Amino acid sequence: MKIKIIKLTESAQVPRYSHADDAGLDLFAIEAQKILPGASALIPTGIAIELPQGTEAQVRPRSGLALKHSITVLNSPGTIDAGYRGEIGVILINHGQETFQVVEGMKIAQMVIAPIMRAEIEEVTELSATQRGEGGFGSTGYA
């Protein structure tokens, strides 16, 4: 599968896989930005993409940023639809207690390309019974 990419700025980096078996392509910041504790920020990547029909791109957090700095993608996963042609931006949130400094060229998120399925919606008056029923939100225990 081919993904077409346009660099919107000279400093933009084309997303790339760090390892042969990686699911996600690294996304890079094109500018420095501070994120205060508890705050969020839209970080530009300087790229736009063209996805094949029937696919989406999911923007996901980087585990190292989450573990070491409490930085994650706010709307995780963020969805990029095949018809979108604008700049990809990553909404990061700082769950930590210290200001986080995004630097130009930093890996800020990963982008996973996935197939989509379109559902046919059928409105009904009742749903079929299951063993689980309406149990949710911890109904199966904590362990």
Swiss-Prot record:
PANTHER family: DEOXYURIDINE 5'-TRIPHOSPHATE NUCLEOTIDOHYDROLASE (PTHR11241:SF0). One of its GO terms (biological process) is dUTP catabolic process. InterPro entries: dUTPase (IPR008181), dUTPase-like (IPR029054), dUTPase-like_sf (IPR036157), dUTPase_trimeric (IPR033704). NCBIfam families: dut, PRK00601.1. GO terms for molecular function: dUTP diphosphatase activity; magnesium ion binding. Its EC number is 3.6.1.23. Pathway: Pyrimidine metabolism; dUMP biosynthesis; dUMP from dCTP (dUTP route): step 2/2. HAMAP family: dUTPase_bact. It comes from Acaryochloris marina (strain MBIC 11017). This is Deoxyuridine 5'-triphosphate nucleotidohydrolase. It comes from the Bacteria. Belongs to the dUTPase family. The gene is dut. Substrate binds at residues 62-64, 75, 79-81. Its cofactor is Mg(2+). This enzyme is involved in nucleotide metabolism: it produces dUMP, the immediate precursor of thymidine nucleotides and it decreases the intracellular concentration of dUTP so that uracil cannot be incorporated into DNA. Keywords: Hydrolase, Magnesium, Metal-binding, Nucleotide metabolism. It catalyses: dUTP + H2O = dUMP + diphosphate + H(+).
